[in-house]
Structures are given as structure tokens and as C-alpha cells.
């Protein structure tokens, strides 16, 4: 009988390990291609300074971009919060910093509320409304909302934890003649959406909105980890994947998008990175992203396996068991 119990436990443990491995592989399948390559897409230019030093005297692609009719990024700063009272934001809001720093230079700082966003989508992006309302997490709606407002009006988007450091730097980026410019993620291999700017009716932003709809609410629910679910469906993974597809569709001969070099970007804006919406999985991945270069699979995958192994060891040592559920109640987490 004891032998039977021992074999049963081993079998259950083996089946559990196989199940965990299957779930892990399934979740990793949602990690987009940009995390597996060592360069940005051809349509995206890495911006390391503005204005660029040592410009050649002959006509350049930059000069050609400047000549594109109507290509400019308006002097509008967009920010989003649930209501018009930013005092309810859980960290120091950057709204006053943007107003004090840029309004004297003929900039307008707009604060969009949840009701404003829904009204704009109903009026001009009705095809997106079911997807927008179907997201299980508010941050997914916020991710889509920022793309919508900048596509509709053009200008600059900044999270409420992004503070301006250089008005001249912001203005210079607007004049580079690029369609859109984004803050970096994954060591400038990807595009982040906490700070970006674009021309009005940017074709790329519209492309990204359609990509967000394609990855809509029902599809994103297949992802178990909330952090990965957000990043894949509406966040930096989605935006970066959209930029690569946009690049392939356009077959561009010169960059139309820009991503800030991490060091240079830090001279233009400061990101306090409140990350108030993140759960434990998000905090873990953010720590790894901040301290370890995990963009390559031979680094990232072993780290995930090691983390999984550590959890298994802790569970085994503590002799963890499922808590007995009370009659009429499920297990709470």
C-alpha cells in the first residue's frame, strides 16, 4: 500500500511538471519576434541625439523627410486619467510639470477622462468600440486610448508619471520629419507607449489600432499572466509587432518611425515608472528587465525556468497543500 502511494505521488508530480511545462511553453508563444532579434526594424530609426551631430552637407534622408508636405507633430500634449481630478492619481502627477514647462512655448496640454475617450471612440472609431469595452483590464483600455487620441489630433502622449526634462529636446524631436517617435523598451529593440509623439492621422497609429483589435479581448484572455496579457494585447509588444508588420507592408526605403536611445531619451523626459497597475508577475519581469538583459531567448528562457524551479523548491520544502475549500466557497487567492 505504501509503495502504491509513493508511486501515485511520483505520477502526480510528473503530470504536474508536464502540465506546468506545457503552460510555460504556451505562454512563451505569445512573446513576439522582436524579443528574439538583435536590431530594430528597418522603418525605425534609433535617435541618439537631436539635432544630430556631424550632419553631412549633401541632401540626406532627413532633408527629404522635412520636405514631405504636411508632416509635422502638433504642439499638443495628451494625458489620460479616470477623471479630471489628477489628485486621485497614486503618484506625483506630471500634469503641472508639462503645463509649466511647455505652455509658455505655445503648447496645449490636454487631459482626457474616461468619458472623453468613450465619446471620441463612439464618434470616430466605432469599429473599435466593442474591443475597447471588452478588455478585462482598465490598463488595456488606457493603452488603446492613448493611440486613439494621438491619431485623432496628433501631438505628444505622456503618462502621468512621465515628466519633461527638456522643452528644446521635445521640440527638436517634433521637427525631425518622422511620422512617429517612441520611447524605448528592451534596450531599444522595442517601442514603449509611456511616451510617444506622432503626426495627426498617422498611418502607423491606425495600423497599431487595427493590430490591437486583432489581438482583442477574447484572444488576450488565453494569456494567464496579467502582465504578459497587457503587454501582448495593447502594450509595447503589440506596438512593436505592429511596427515590424508596418515595415514589411510599406517596403520603405527610409525610416518613418523613430525610437529614442535609452540614454538620450533620459535627457528629454524622466519616467518615474509608477507601475501601479502591475501585479506580482509584472514586478518580477520589471525587475529582470531593469537589471538583466533578458531580450535574448538564451537568457530569458533559462531565467524563467530557474524562477519556476525556485518556486517548486519552496513549495516542496514548505510541504504546501491546497487549502481545503469551505462548503459553498471556492479557494481565494
Regions found by a protein language model. Name each.
Residues 2-142, 158-333:
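Glycosyltransferase-associated regions of secretory-pathway enzymes
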Amino acid at each position: 500500500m505504501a509503495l502504491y502511494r509513493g508511486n501515485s505521488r511520483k505520477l502526480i508530480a510528473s503530470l504536474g511538471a508536464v502540465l506546468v511545462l506545457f503552460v510555460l511553453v504556451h505562454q512563451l508563444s505569445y512573446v513576439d519576434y522582436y524579443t528574439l532579434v538583435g536590431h530594430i526594424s528597418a522603418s525605425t530609426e534609433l535617435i541618439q541625439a537631436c539635432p544630430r551631430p556631424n550632419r553631412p552637407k549633401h541632401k540626406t534622408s532627413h532633408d527629404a523627410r522635412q520636405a514631405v508636405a504636411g508632416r509635422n507633430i502638433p504642439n499638443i500634449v495628451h494625458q489620460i486619467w479616470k477623471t479630471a481630478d489628477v489628485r486621485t492619481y497614486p503618484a506625483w502627477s506630471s500634469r503641472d510639470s508639462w503645463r509649466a514647462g511647455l505652455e509658455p512655448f505655445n503648447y496645449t496640454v490636454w487631459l482626457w477622462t474616461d468619458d472623453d475617450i468613450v465619446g471620441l471612440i463612439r464618434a470616430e472609431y466605432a469599429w473599435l468600440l466593442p474591443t475597447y469595452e471588452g478588455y478585462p483590464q482598465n490598463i488595456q483600455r488606457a493603452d488603446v486610448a492613448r493611440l486613439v487620441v494621438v491619431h485623432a489630433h496628433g501631438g505628444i502622449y505622456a503618462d502621468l508619471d512621465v515628466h519633461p526634462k527638456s522643452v528644446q529636446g521635445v521640440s527638436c524631436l517634433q521637427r525631425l520629419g518622422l511620422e512617429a517617435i517612441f520611447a524605448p523598451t528592451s534596450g531599444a529593440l522595442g517601442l514603449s507607449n509611456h511616451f510617444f509623439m506622432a503626426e495627426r492621422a498617422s498611418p502607423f497609429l491606425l495600423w497599431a489600432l487595427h493590430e490591437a483589435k486583432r489581438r482583442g479581448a477574447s484572444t488576450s484572455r488565453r494569456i494567464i499572466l496579467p502582465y504578459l496579457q497587457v503587454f501582448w494585447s495593447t502594450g509595447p509588444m503589440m506596438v512593436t509587432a505592429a511596427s515590424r508588420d508596418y515595415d514589411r507592408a510599406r517596403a520603405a526605403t527610409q525610416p518613418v518611425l523613430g525610437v529614442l536611445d535609452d540614454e538620450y531619451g533620459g535627457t528629454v523626459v524622466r519616467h518615474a515608472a509608477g507601475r501601479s497597475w502591475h501585479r506580482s508577475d509584472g514586478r518580477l519581469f520589471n525587475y529582470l528587465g531593469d537589471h538583466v538583459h533578458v531580450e535574448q531567448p538564451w537568457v530569458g528562457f533559462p531565467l524563467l525556468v530557474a524562477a519556476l524551479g525556485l518556486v517548486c523548491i519552496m513549495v516542496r520544502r514548505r510541504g504546501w497543500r491546497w487549502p481545503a475549500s469551505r462548503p459553498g466557497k471556492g479557494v481565494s487567492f
